[in-house]
Amino acid sequence: VEVLMGGSGGELAFIPNELQVNAGEQIVFKNNAGFPHNVIFDEDAVPAGVDVSSISMSEEDLLNAPGETYVVKLDKKGTYRFFCAPHQGIGMSGIVTVN
């Protein structure tokens, strides 16, 4: 499953911002527009027992260039909220449901 980070028209958003995957399925977050983005999972909005540091990028790490990717697999069923640290204040976030 591919999630674009930034819209072709300059939108600061994850596209899609809601998705469903199977446990263990690969999710590829791809910088689409060349703004600096990252993927941080919200420690208060993931299934109990999930260590967000093992699935999130570091807040200091950024995908700067178009085409750069971050790949993650989520093994525990449930709902995970994620966001882009630099653009969280303007609502760049999303939800993935693992079935």
From Swiss-Prot:
NCBIfam families for the chain: cyanin_plasto (TIGR02656)
Superkingdom per UniProt: Eukaryota
Gene encoding the protein: PETE
Membrane found in the keyword field: yes
Purpose: Participates in electron transfer between P700 and the cytochrome b6-f complex in photosystem I.
Membrane-protein topology: Peripheral membrane protein
GO molecular function annotations of the record: copper ion binding; electron transporter, transferring electrons from cytochrome b6/f complex of photosystem II activity
Family membership: Belongs to the plastocyanin family.
UniProt cofactor(s): Cu(2+)
InterPro entries assigned: BlueCu_1, BlueCu_1_BS, Copper_blue_Plastocyanin, Cupredoxin, Plastocyanin
Annotated Cu cation binding sites: H37, C84, H87, M92
Protein name: Plastocyanin
SUPFAM superfamilies: Cupredoxins (SSF49503)
Compartment(s) of residence: Plastid, Chloroplast thylakoid membrane
Pfam families registered for this protein in UniProt: Copper-bind (PF00127)
Domain Plastocyanin-like residues, every copy: 1-99
GO CC annotation: chloroplast thylakoid lumen; chloroplast thylakoid membrane
Keywords carried by this UniProt record: Chloroplast, Copper, Electron transport, Membrane, Metal-binding, Plastid, Thylakoid, Transport
